[in-house]
Structure formats: C-alpha cells, structure tokens
C-alpha cells in the first residue's frame, strides 16, 4: 500500500487507484429523474456491477491496488462518531435542511444504522417512504417538492470517481462540482482526505468551498511540471487561472505550466478527457470534433508571471502547444473512430477517447469502440478491453471510472 498521493503523469505505471462500485443508487434513477441526475439512460445494475468488477480485476491483474471510496468513508466514520455526525450535518445542510422535524428524523435514521449501511444509504439516497415524518408544510403535500420521492437524492454518478477530486503531484484538488446531483460526492472526499490516516498531511491545492467550478475529468497530469485542464461545460476559466496561481506559488507543487484547452461546452463533451487523453510519452487520443473546420482550437499556456500573477500565451494549434510544453519534436494524435464522420462521433459518445493508461503505451478502454481500438493497436498501443454495455450508459469510460492515487514516476 502506498500512502498519500503520487501522480506525476497520466502514463506512469498505475500502482493504486480509487474506485466506487455501482450500488443501489443506480436503481433509484427513473425516467423522470434521469436528466436531473445527469443520465441519458438507466443502467441494469446487476450487469453494471459485473462489468465494474471486471474493470477492477483488470486493474488488479496489472499490478494496481484498488481502493474503494465507500470503504474509506466507512473507516473514517467508524473511527469517530463525532466526524460522522459532523458529516451528516454538513450533508443535510447542503441538501437544504435545517434543524427541525425532517432534519432530526434523517439524522436519527442515518445514525441508527451500522456505519457501512449508512454510507451505502448516503449513496443510494433516502426515500420519503423510509421515514415516518409527519408532513405539515404545503410544500410537502403539493408542488415539485411533494413530487420528489427522496429526502436525499441518490448519487448514481459516484462510480465516476475521476470527477469529485483529482490527484495532482503529491496533492489533490477537491472539486466544486457543477451540478447539485454530484456535489455530495466531493463532500465525501473532503471528509476522507481530512480524516483518513492514509492521506495524513496530503496537500489540498484547492478545496470545494468555492463559487467557481472544476471537475477531475478536465484535469490531466502531462508530466511532473505540466497539467492540462479543459475549459468546458464543467470547468470554468476563472477556476483554472486561480488553480494555476496556487500550483505556481505552493512550495510543495512541482508544476510550472498549465495548458488550458477550450472544448465545446455540451453534454457529449462534458470534460476534456471525453475528447482527449494521454496514452504514451508522445501519443494521445483525440476526438477531431473539438477543432473547427481549419483544425484550430483555443489553447492557452499559463506560466508564472511577476508578483504572483500568471502569464498567458494563446495558440490555436493543439499539436504545436503539446510539443511546446512537453518539449517534443514529434507526437502522434490518434483520432477517435479513425476520424470517420460517422464512427468518430458515435465512438466518442461511447467514450472511445476516454482511455486509462496503466503504463506508457498500455491502456484500458471499452470494447465497444472497435474502430478506435483497432487503430490504437495499429499505433503500437497495448489495449485491455473491458465490458461496456451498462457502465457506458452513464456517459463515462475507463478514465472517468478511476482516480489514480499512486503512479510510478517516469
């Protein structure tokens, strides 16, 4: 077991990774709540769990320790009832509850459970019919609040452990998630990082207590000095500049360059890693749809300036920008779906660009994106194909479903 965080690249040998096994929360999605919960379809839980177990076993078979966030949270709350009560208070306040009949009823209900069951219930959500709470307000009896079946909504996106936090060097960002459906996920991370002995003294480059948003799918660690961050539907440019200032100023950080890549702001391309991932020292997957007809895309190189400020250089050529910040003479951009006008968007939608490198030139990715998989193999990449029929319904692939905690340095 490697304590703390050590992630200085996207491609170093993966030694430890944070996961969440899909649970009852997935079965609490309905057609009426799919959009609110950021899903386009409802996965079949039994098969999704089998697929996730296959994914986790693939990682273990290739030398990675699999760590489950729900187990870490259980360990933290079992160790300290005070921490558990503080977490529940924080959770309920963020859900809009204040001390009173419902708040007290939820607190009593959750604290009466064994800690493991409580953590599972936080992920699964608390239905209104689970508690005998007298409803006295009109909002409890009529209108949109009354139509909601839950006191606490489920967290079905939690198996995408990439986004609530991001390992970066020896530290981590704990992220202000864009949509309410995901915000409790990073609250769980906050309590784990602050209280689990495994992460004692781990620096937090940026916590979740901000008004501007960022998500881990937009945060890529290119090498020990350079990170790429997407300007996307889920991550704001203001956040990127503020994080760059922190990374440049903090003596525990080794980063001196941030590459900000602006991608289309839409659901299909919600994060940078849905359209661009690093798979070797000089090889990347890319979805060509992020560029305009002339092949241009807005790319910004941020470096330390005077008096704690940031200097910004604007380019419109992704390949040239990558060569510049990585000091490469050549690099290989491998197009999702081989750049075909039909195969590329189809396979990007099914996370063909969302690969997880487990070593230089060795990746894990969904089996369904066969055009991209064959092209990757032609380019010399070793590909571990994982099952995808149900997991992919949540709009995330192998990188989305994993948060590296420890990679070997290159």
From Swiss-Prot:
Catalytic activity, EC: 3.5.3.6
Species name: Lactococcus lactis subsp. cremoris (strain MG1363)
Keyword tags: Arginine metabolism, Cytoplasm, Hydrolase
Cysteines joined through disulfide linkages: none
Pfam families according to UniProt: ADI
Xref: HAMAP family: Arg_deiminase (MF_00242)
Broad class of where this protein is predominantly found: cytoplasm
Enzyme type, top EC level: hydrolase
Catalytic reactions of this protein: L-arginine + H2O = L-citrulline + NH4(+)
Protein name listed in UniProt: Arginine deiminase
Pathway the protein takes part in: Amino-acid degradation; L-arginine degradation via ADI pathway; carbamoyl phosphate from L-arginine: step 1/2
A single cellular component GO annotation: cytoplasm
């Amino acid at each position: 077991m490697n304590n703390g965080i050590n992630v200085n690249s996207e491609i170093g040998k993966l030694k430890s990774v944070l996961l969440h096994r899909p649970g009852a929360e997935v079965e609490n999605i309905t057609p009426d709540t799919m959009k609110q919960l950021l899903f386009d379809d409802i996965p079949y839980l039994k098969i999704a769990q089998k697929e996730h177990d296959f994914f986790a076993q693939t990682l273990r078979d290739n030398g990675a320790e699999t760590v489950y966030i729900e187990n870490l949270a259980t360990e933290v709350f079992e160790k300290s009832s005070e921490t558990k009560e503080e977490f529940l208070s924080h959770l309920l306040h963020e859900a809009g509850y204040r001390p009173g009949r419902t708040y007290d009823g939820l607190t009593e209900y959750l604290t009466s459970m064994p800690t493991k069951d409580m953590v599972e219930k936080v992920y699964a959500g608390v239905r209104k019919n689970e508690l005998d709470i007298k409803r006295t307000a009109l909002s409890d009896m009529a209108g949109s609040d009354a139509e909601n079946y839950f006191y606490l909504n489920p967290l079905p996106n939690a198996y995408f452990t990439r986004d609530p936090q991001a390992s970066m060097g020896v530290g981590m960002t704990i992220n202000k998630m864009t949509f309410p459906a995901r915000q409790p996920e990073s609250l769980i991370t906050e309590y784990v990082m602050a209280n689990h002995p495994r992460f004692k003294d781990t620096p937090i480059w940026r916590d979740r207590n901000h008004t501007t948003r960022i998500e881990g799918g937009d945060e890529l660690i290119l090498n020990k000095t350079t990170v790429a961050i997407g300007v996307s539907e889920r991550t704001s440019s203001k956040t990127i500049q503020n994080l760059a200032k922190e990374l440049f100023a903090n003596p525990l950080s080794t980063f001196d360059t941030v590459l900000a890549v602006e991608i289309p702001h839409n659901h299909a391309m919600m994060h940078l890693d849905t359209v661009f991932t690093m798979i070797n020292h000089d090889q990347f997957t890319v979805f060509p749809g992020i560029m305009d007809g002339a092949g241009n895309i807005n790319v910004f190189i941020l470096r330390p300036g005077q008096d704690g400020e940031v200097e910004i250089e604007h380019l419109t050529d992704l390949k040239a920008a990558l060569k510049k910040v990585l000091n490469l003479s050549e690099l290989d951009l491998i197009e999702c779906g081989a750049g075909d006008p039909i195969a590329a968007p189809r396979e990007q939608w099914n996370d063909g660009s969302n690969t997880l490198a487990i070593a230089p030139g060795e990746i894990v990715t969904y089996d369904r994106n066969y055009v991209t998989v064959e092209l990757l193999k032609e380019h010399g990449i070793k590909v571990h194909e994982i099952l995808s029929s149900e997991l992919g319904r949540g709009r995330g692939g192998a990188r989305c479903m994993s948060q590296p905690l420890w990679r070997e340095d290159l």
